[in-house]
Amino acid sequence: MEPSKQEVPKLMETPPNISNDSSATEKGEATRQQQLPNNRYALTVDEVIEQHIGALGFAQILHALLVSIAWIFDAQTTLISIFSDAQPAARLLATGAIVEGASLCGLASGEWEWIGPKSDTVVSEWNLICQHKFLVAVPSTLFFIGSLFGSGVYGYLADSWFGRKKTLLLSCVLTFVTAFAISFSPNVWVYAFLRFANGFFRSGIGSCCIVLATEIVGKKWRGQVGQYGFFFFTLGFLSLPLMAYLERKSWRNLYRIISFLPLGYAVCLLPFAYESPRWLLVKGRNKEAMVVLKKLARLNGKQLPADLSLVDPIPERDDQTSSSEKFWKTKWAVKRIIMVMMAGFGSGFVYYGIQLNAENLNFNLYLTVAVNALMEFPAVFIGSFLLGVMNRRPLFSNSSYLAGFACLLCAVLSIHRVIRAISVAKWLQLAVEAVGFMASSTAYDVLYVYCVELFPTNVRNTAVSLLRQAFMLGASAAPLLVALGRESAMMSFIVFGVASVLSGIVSLWLRETRNAPLYETLAQQGKAEEIENETIMIT
């Protein structure tokens, strides 16, 4: 059966000088109803949500909160190295004077000591200074490289064999195993290997969380729901300075504490989450998809019509292998994912780089990280509001520009003679860095939501996972630049600033998706966008 034509936004995948009239989308989609035998009719999942369940109700909010809790552990696992791999303060034994990290290299081992026990961080325990200073960047770099590879594996599993929910469960359990194992590392090389494994296994959390949360809400609320999920990432980030301060004498205990949280979530809370009805439908499990939709409707105080069926998005059922092959053979999809990944590389590089670079500011590490974490809250609020009133493309690009310019200003404020000339330079640098981090956080979060809307259901998790791979590839380069920043903070901020501006420029060639429908298959989306482009060319 062929669905009747839907009204789609008149947008074209070109640089942003082409205006678009979003008011056309506000007229709503024409209801598509397919008459079936026995007086039954079929709707798409989008239509069932909009017409019978509600675009956003108690059920969707509760479900989004439930699956988004896992972002807490993702943040803790990702950013723990800010504290576990930091270089602690040292002092001269003769005078008790504080010694800068670079100055230790000219001293004999008996002339100085770490302030506090050697178990504070991996740097003090294994003496990763001077000729070994770049070794401290290896574990974090391998963590993000592991996340890069893991994202591809989890994306395939979530779109094919396991679905979103089981993949999230698997990722949480394996995150616990590897994080707990890290606390027993005997040397930096075992530590680095286990960080790689930890990054690999935790990489399924983020993509599954955002897809599970957004696939059951109406198109008007997709951006906001995707953004609100990042509140939990912020909570995880904000919890780190407190936990790190309480366990500041043992980086091993810090790892043990954060390791048990994802296990508790996987056992106690995740079983109550629903699998995505869109994924169930694409896999031919129509009855299970209807069961989930009925539960959502019931929680919203509504009931689905007894004669309702779901439109099969794949009349001739393909297996996942053919869907993956079609993804890489579909020209518009490949072009789009390349641009998304290019923007994601710069965004991930800057977002994680600013956080890891906190120790290179002229400020207290715990306070700096806490300020950065607090800036995530206005970033989410502002991003959520702007997603409701602005197009995705300019929102991402402008946020990237702001983050880039803030980093460049931080570079100027890092010059020693500027710090000496301006008495409030340290506070000003912290404020500018916080604004830059807020902007980079907004860009990072918006790009997640943007990617969800750019691709259809049968490859959506794969696309989001590829974006995460780009994020992680960018993030894997950040620790090396942070290590360089210990010698030249100005240089690290300059590189972060340029990368952020470039990622914003790349995004200008992405298609706008605000208020556009979510399609189920590549063929369905390609056909709709082709008709849309032809219409624009005619008009």
UniProtKB/Swiss-Prot annotation:
Keyword Transmembrane assigned: yes
Entry keyword set: ATP-binding, Cell membrane, Developmental protein, Ion transport, Membrane, Nucleotide-binding, Transmembrane, Transmembrane helix, Transport
Tissue: Expressed in vascular tissues and at sites of lateral root formation. Mostly present in floral buds, flowers and immature siliques.
Basic and acidic residues: bias regions: 1-10
Protein name as annotated: Organic cation/carnitine transporter 1
Metal-binding is among the record's keywords: no
Pfam families (alphabetical): Sugar_tr (PF00083)
Membrane topology of the entry: Multi-pass membrane protein
GO CC terms, sorted: plasma membrane
Organism: Arabidopsis thaliana
Residue stretches spanning the membrane: 53-73, 134-154, 173-193, 196-218, 225-245, 257-277, 337-357, 369-389, 395-415, 435-455, 464-484, 490-510
InterPro entries in alphabetical order: MFS_dom, MFS_sugar_transport-like, MFS_trans_sf
Family statement: Belongs to the major facilitator (TC 2.A.1) superfamily. Organic cation transporter (TC 2.A.1.19) family.
Disruption phenotype: Reduced sensitivity to carnitine and high degree of root branching.
Region listing for Disordered, in residue ranges: 1-35
Gene induction: Accumulates in embryo upon imbibition.
